[in-house]
Amino acid sequence: YSLSGSFRVYGDERYDYVAVSLPEKLPYRSQMQINPSRIVVDIFGATSNTNWVTQLRSAREVRNTWYEQLEDDVLRVYIELAHPQHWGYRISYDTAGTRLLVRVKRQPTSMDIRKMNIAIDAGHGGLNSGASGVNSGILEKDYTLRISKELEKHLKKGGTRSVFMTRNTDTTLDMPDRILMLREADPDLLVSIHLNSSSRDTVQGTSTFYRYIGFRSLSEKILTRMLELKLSEFGNVGHFNFALSGPTEYPNCLVEVAFLSNPGDEKRILDPKFQKNVAKKIAEGIRDWLKENR
């Protein structure tokens, strides 16, 4: 087994960090926990030889850090957060491969939507057309872009300082490229817009999706507002294995507005007024979520 060394918890002007000294690169996995909010990292092949967990006051989001030897070769690191809401984290090794670094994003100082950096992903695009309308034959990629642009317009009109679009045109973008773009944009949150489809034309309704429990509340707030459009409820779906739900760096939510395969839903999707109202409800859901986290 590899013996762990000292831990160091500190912050800079943007992030907090938990650094774990190790003699070599070891595999790890992480998870978010809520009530209380924690990041938990399991390091495989590691046995504790740690005598120092130094915690500096420059760390503002990391409230406490400790470890537990789960098994002879599994070291679990607990990172307790200062706020209930997870704002994201990233795990990497330093260039020498001897220090596992957990970078923790702090809660923004203001919960005003105007001061947020919000990313919007219009699903599909270019060669990837997505689903098609059951009667009209419209393509998902075109209408996700229309709704995304309406959301961008609504947010900017409301004063949001920064809105990042993964695409503004009908262009082909694969998932790794989108993830790299989003990592560079470093948003406070991401909303991805899609239109659903089923082999049964009776299936209908709106839904939201998330992967990590720490990001669930954003999808809940958006779904609550979407249901005000008198759409059927298809539900809030967790543990969703979608590429853009995978990054842990920022809260994210996938919105499946309605079903293109259902004649009633399709008719509404075609309506420009409905597209505007969807954008408005998503923005209201974001505002509700920010208000809850003040």
Predicted regions and their residues:
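Substrate-binding/active-site groove segments that recognize
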Residues: 121-124, 206-208
